[in-house]
Amino acid sequence: MADTTIEAITAREVLDSRGNPTIEVDVYLESGDMGRAIVPSGASTGAFEALELRDGDKSRYGGKGVLKAVENVNTTIAEALEGEDAADQMRIDRMLIDLDGAENKGRLGANAILGVSLACAKAAAAAHGLPLYRYLGGIHAHVLPVPMMNILNGGKHAQNSTDFQEFMIMPVGAPSFREALRWGSEIYQSLKKVIHDRGGSTNVGDEGGFAPSLPTNEAALQIIVEAVERAGYQLGDQVMLAMDPACTELYKDGKYHLEREGRSLTSAEMVEYWADIAARYPLISLEDGLAEEDWEGWKLLRARLGDRIQLVGDDFLVTNVKRLARAISEQAANSILIKLNQIGTLTETLDAITMANRAGWTAVVSHRSGESEDVTIADLVVATNAGQIKTGAPARTDRVAKYNQLLRIEEELDSAAHYAGMGAFRVAR
């Protein structure tokens, strides 16, 4: 058996897909194996997320440098973990949590901690001669996810676009992941033509989706419907729609302000707004349809639409088991978005997925808007059989890298691979 004892840990400052600094961590084992991880970063971040440590030195990268986090890995964390077993993930992560000591991991930085946590797992997988999905998921890891493709961007991810942040397609009717990716890519190219034909801009946002200026929020749904039909696919059967309006960004003084429509809505009115959209479009998933602290609104939303639509908590739940446990008991939402850097360790991420599954909820593994060539989430979604991945449009290498990794995994699994399709959802359609 290869020796999985940690020999050395080193970190460095690298760039993410937005040109901002982030942290990369290498973990070296006595066996000679190495694991490397790059930590992602979000644009719209939940107030309850683990804290990403930034330098605040305005003379470097506008204050966004991560040299403190790098130093914390190279000194405090390296000194504590060298000599430990990288294959004992729970112990590694518990040590990292204790070493930081803060609830939000703000002392050493959740970015420093996550980089080490993931690099340890990758190093241990390499030492065992296993791909990461197999190392983490064991012999039962075989489900390829339905991609939730963000093909139209608005909100914080684009300027002069819609109030709502993300409009997505989900190719649920495809027979395999490879075909799902093809369908999504063809619809994406079709959307580009639709926007172009209407005289719109085909600039892309952070996650590869187009960001045209549109007169109303519903206009975004209308042009996606046209793009799906032009590409030759059946909406509501082969392809479903999903949205992430990121409603925390719209919530002020107890109301939801839809500037594109000149309206301010109460929580109850916002729930009815979504019910109306769901009645007229084949919407299967709605993420952050209400604000992160609007618990009463979330309960109302679940009661109104929870049997028909996947109601995903992102800013609302921040991959946090405490918030998730409360949401499960209060019947607020029925699905959780899983972002590694919201909680900061692999163990806590896996705990959140397990808790969701036990409650009959779904879990959607997600990227952040600031990404890199790191493909960990592709392996994670297969390892956990989560069945859904959210990693942007089929454009920009930082997004496509994850899709390409899933193609490789599907090929490697061969006849054992199972594409989740509509089985990824626990709602009646």
UniProtKB/Swiss-Prot annotation:
Binds a second Mg(2+) ion via substrate during catalysis. PROSITE patterns: ENOLASE. The keyword Magnesium applies. InterPro entries: Enolase, Enolase-like_C_sf, Enolase-like_N, Enolase_C, Enolase_CS, Enolase_N. Its EC number is 4.2.1.11. It catalyses: (2R)-2-phosphoglycerate = phosphoenolpyruvate + H2O. One of its GO terms (cellular component) is cell surface. Belongs to the enolase family. This is Enolase. The gene is eno.
